[in-house]
């Protein structure tokens, strides 16, 4: 049962519980209200807000687009979606330079992949790709 008041969904909550929100995660851990695989739907309608911080990058591209479409379906008119995700452009600019030797490039590539996979990231977004995906979802 959601808390009283407007429906607000916190997707990928983990241990970062938000009071007054429905805290959702794929794992049953303390503070999670609803355990679900959001790639199969959110299970709610008419939400005022959806918050997903450092979540989208953990989905494969097709699943992420489906999630964004589901957010559009679930949000009531005037509702809002707030997300944060690592910016691929920043990762590229800060970790990979074209004017360095091959060994430095190889080490940068290893560091990026270690960080990318070590945090179980599936797909990194830049602003342009995320904007295009959001616009295509409505």
Short names for language-model regions:
Residues 1-3:
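Membrane-proximal basic amphipathic "stem/tether" segments
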Residues 6-91:
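Conserved SAM-binding loop
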Residues 61-76, 80-138:
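S-adenosyl-L-methionine-dependent methyltransferase catalytic module, highlighting the catalytic core
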């Amino acid at each position: 049962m959601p808390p009283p008041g407007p429906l607000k969904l916190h997707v990928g909550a983990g241990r970062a519980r938000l009071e007054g929100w429905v805290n959702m995660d794929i794992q049953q851990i303390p503070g999670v209200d609803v355990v679900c695989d959001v790639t199969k739907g959110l299970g709610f309608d008419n939400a005022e807000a959806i918050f997903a911080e450092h979540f989208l990058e953990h989905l494969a591209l097709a699943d992420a687009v489906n999630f964004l479409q589901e957010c559009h379906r679930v949000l009531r008119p005037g509702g809002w979606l707030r997300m944060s995700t690592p910016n691929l452009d920043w990762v590229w600019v800060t970790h990979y330079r074209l004017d360095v030797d091959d060994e430095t490039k190889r080490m940068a590539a290893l560091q990026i992949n270690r960080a990318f996979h070590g945090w179980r990231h599936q797909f990194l977004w830049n602003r342009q790709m995320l904007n295009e995906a959001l616009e295509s979802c409505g």
